[in-house]
Amino acid sequence: MNTDTFMCSSDEKQTRSPLSLYSEYQRMEIEFRAPHIMPTSHWHGQVEVNVPFDGDVEYLINNEKVSINQGHITLFWACTPHQLTDTGTCQSMAIFNLPMHLFLSWPLDKDLINHVTHGMVIKSLATQQLSPFEVRRWQQELNSPNEQIRQ
């Protein structure tokens, strides 16, 4: 059973809408770790960005296999049921969870926003646009006691 109040899992007995998980007080979260296979699908109200740095991984997103190639950035609205099904040889992956209100506040292309909010999985064409060094630095900044650095 999932204990994260902002996430739903397919093994829960009580169903909840991912839209009910929204909170304007949520902040962006960044994980930098080895990916792990998920026993069930889950969903949450944030936009999820994944970057595997040293190997390809495979997700099941809305019952469709989605491969994320090493070094590529993949973005999707995580209210769509998703499950990491194959970690391959990947040992280092960045996972960004962006609250929807934050994502929508950025000056992004309207087509991109439309694609994401309609369940499309967006993949970068180019590789290596983000480094592990940058991910670690952003993690440190988000966890800084200095509010000006966190912003």
Predicted regions and their residues:
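Short acidic-glycine-tyrosine-enriched beta hairpin
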Residues: 63-78
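A structure-centric signal for secondary-structure junctions around beta-strands
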Residues: 46, 70, 90-92
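A short, compositionally biased micro-patch
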Residues: 52-54, 77, 87
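A hydrophobic/aromatic-rich effector-binding and dimerization subdomain
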Residues: 2-28, 81-144
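Generic protein-terminus/edge-of-domain signal
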Residues: 1-67, 112
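All-alpha amphipathic helical-bundle segments outside canonical DNA-binding/catalytic cores
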Residues: 143-151
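Conserved GNAT-family N-acetyltransferase fold
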Residues: 50, 74, 96
